[in-house]
Amino acid sequence: MSKITIEKLNLFYGETQALKNISLNVHENEILGIIGPANSGKSSLLRALNRLYEIDYARIAGKIMLDGKNIFNIPINELRRRVGLIFATPVVLPGTIYKNMSYGPKLHQRIKKQDLDNIVTRALKAANLWDEVKDRLDDSASTLSGGQQQRLCIARTLAMNPEVIMMDEPCSGLDPVSTAKIEATMFALKSDYTFILVTNNTKQAARTADRTAFFLSGELVEFDKTEKVFTHPDDQRTDDYIRGRFG
């Protein structure tokens, strides 16, 4: 079942076209990997999916459907709750770990302290972080390591009860142990959420993604099951990129 359907999507920043006639679908409860060199349109696609591109000099054409409904007919706050975005550099809010976790739920609803505590605990456990911070909830979030901060961002997103979690280079600059923890978290959550993972690390896409899309210069060059893309690609450019001949 398709969670997201994209049809003939074009995105412009001024006179520069960032996405060119993109059509693809995202299955519910899959990890979709998106690979490609810098400036290939990967991050622009994520920003289009929750309308972060909406700035004065950007314009878009085409259709993006979430559960069969045009995202432009969904209130922006609801859309961004349902389709969360985690950036390459962890964005922690000023204040404690607990305040970072509780900010979103408190902003969107009136909630009792006990219910809020339960949301925070569940989300931190789901993000594989609870055991490391359960005795530090009143510490500043800035005291966490880079990998912990990234998992805090995942937990903060989970606290909003999303349906799709988009991750833009979430392991950029992290050590192998931190990377493995984030990948393990994705696998553990996959039965309940849909993931879109942008990565410049082709090995990470090969390890984690059910299907992989290869972008180049704003175009979708190849899109198929990950094993097929990495072992028998249809386009020579895909093979060249995967084998490190460019990028």
Where are these regions (language model features)?
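Conserved ABC ATPase "signature" region
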Residues: 114-134
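Helical segment within the ABC ATPase nucleotide-binding domain
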Residues: 179-191
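Conserved catalytic motifs of ABC-family nucleotide-binding domains
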Residues: 161
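ABC ATPase "signature
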Residues: 223-224
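Catalytic Walker B motif of ABC-type/P-loop ATPase nucleotide-binding domains
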Residues: 165-168
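Conserved ABC ATPase signature
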Residues: 139-144, 148
